[in-house]
Curated annotation (Swiss-Prot):
The species this protein was found in: Rattus norvegicus
Result when mutating K186N: Strongly reduces S-adenosyl-L-homocysteine hydrolase activity
Cofactor requirement: NAD(+)
Biological classification of the source: Eukaryota, Metazoa, Chordata, Craniata, Vertebrata
Function comment: Catalyzes the hydrolysis of S-adenosyl-L-homocysteine to form adenosine and homocysteine. Binds copper ions.
Chief location bin: cytoplasm
Xref: CDD domains: SAHH
Modification sites for Phosphotyrosine: Y193
UniProt name for this protein: Adenosylhomocysteinase
EC main group: hydrolase
Underlying gene: Ahcy
EC number: 3.13.2.1
Length: 432
């Protein structure tokens, strides 16, 4: 049984360093600290056996310890082979929480790690906390006998949410799920402001390239693409956007970006960033037209946006510069610099999003787990959202850290607007 192996990490000796990093992160994660203050005594997650599959970072470690403080048992794996921060994993293992994650897993090891999270000493998992859908898919396809005992899934990211809706449409989804990604305090903060900071961190750590004056091509102009485009423009790049959606394309044009196709943009760019969550965004024909030493990276969840297989099969030479940085020599004499093997550049080459913005996302995760565990009758099989009032509560929990002072409605104003004096302040369809 899996419970015979308490953990598997790169180096348990990194635990002390990891604990120091967690202590600092906690001070930057007021939402999770609020959850501990509110619920540590009542332990609403008592009895929950949560299998988690989400990037094993310092911030995730704070989330894990929050879930445990609220009464849950937790077993954890990372949702990406390169995203684990080994000191964070070691700190969690040292705290006695089963974790199976290390930076640089093989694809086989990655699946093995997920498998280790399914069985607890008192029985199999009964809750899922997922990022990207790999854990959800594994249980539905390989372990369907466990589905009847699972109360719910909370899904972190755009790719995983697409997966849930696809499963629902095909009649495959068997467990209630909460779409955490589309909570306003997740998608409009983590996806936008998080990527705005962590993309540049990843590119700079990997290449130390001067961004000012370069042409940067951003594939996709959703919340992630918007954050990436803002960051690159802020550093002085001329940014080109590619898009399939006319609304997003118009938004990009109105912000002053050139919008064109990848077939055109590939000839101009010095830096390429894919943000789409789709397949086949940068292909062989694009590589062949790129400038010498074009930098290519991805910040979408999976490694399917960039055709890395084409590079490996068609390049004359591949030179590893350092971990997660490879330089390919093409037959035309031009070189392509690929970051993180086409996987998440901000986690493969840097530390991911800052703690503060992840506190937004992870507070939503905690609330979703509490909702699904304590109110199962409210959530039939399907894909659900957190109530607007909880979304606003997540935002409110982070205002004090930024010295924000909210204006309060008067009774007259509330009556005039036709809303409760303490919110919710916007209808569910409001887009922010």
């Amino acid at each position: 049984m899996a419970d015979k192996l308490p953990y598997k990490v790169a180096d348990i000796g990194l635990a002390a360093w990891g604990r120091k990093a967690l202590d600092i992160a906690e001070n930057e994660m007021p939402g999770l600290m609020r959850m501990r203050e509110m619920y540590s005594a009542s332990k609403p997650l008592k009895g929950a056996r949560i299998a988690g599959c989400l990037h094993m970072t310092v911030e995730t470690a704070v989330l894990i310890e929050t879930l445990v403080a609220l009464g849950a048992e937790v077993r954890w794996s990372s949702c990406n082979i390169f995203s684990t921060q080994d000191h964070a994993a070691a700190a969690i293992a040292k705290a006695g929480i089963p974790v199976f994650a290390w930076k640089g897993e093989t694809d086989e090891e990655y699946l093995w790690c997920i498998e280790q999270t399914l069985h607890f000493k008192d029985g199999p998992l009964n809750m899922i906390l997922d990022d990207g859908g790999d854990l959800t898919n594994l249980i539905h396809t390989k372990h369907p006998q466990l589905l009847s005992g699972i109360r719910g899934i909370s899904e972190e990211t755009t790719t995983g949410v697409h997966n849930l809706y696809k499963m629902m449409a095909n009649g495959i989804l068997k467990v209630p799920a909460i779409n955490v990604n589309d909570s306003v305090t997740k998608s409009k903060f983590d996806n936008l402001y998080g990527c705005r900071e962590s993309l540049i961190d990843g590119i700079k750590r990997a290449t130390d390239v001067m961004i000012a004056g370069k042409v940067a091509v951003v594939a996709g102009y959703g919340d992630v693409g918007k954050g990436c485009a803002q960051a690159l423009r802020g550093f002085g790049a001329r940014v080109i956007i590619t898009e399939i959606d006319p609304i997003n394309a118009l938004q990009a044009a109105m912000e002053g970006y050139e919008v064109t196709t990848m077939d055109e943009a590939c000839k101009e760019g010095n830096i390429f960033v894919t943000t789409t969550g789709c397949v086949d965004i940068i292909l062989g024909r694009h590589f062949e037209q790129m400038k010498d030493d074009a930098i290519v990276c991805n910040i979408g969840h999976f490694d399917v946006e960039i055709d890395v297989k084409w590079l490996n099969e068609n390049a004359v030479e591949k030179v590893n510069i350092k971990p997660q940085v490879d330089r390919y020599l093409l037959k035309n004499g031009h070189r392509i610099i690929l970051l993180a093997e086409g996987r998440l550049v901000n986690l493969g080459c840097a530390m991911g999003h800052p703690s503060f913005v992840m506190s937004n996302s992870f507070t939503n995760q905690v609330m979703a787990q509490i909702e699904l565990w304590t109110h199962p009758d409210k959530y039939p099989v399907g894909v659900h959202f957190l109530p607007k009032k909880l979304d606003e509560a997540v935002a409110e929990a982070h205002l004090g850290k930024l010295n924000v002072k909210l204006t309060k409605l008067t009774e007259k104003q509330a009556q005039y607007l036709g809303m409760p004096i303490n919110g919710p302040f916007k209808p569910d369809h409001y887009r922010y």
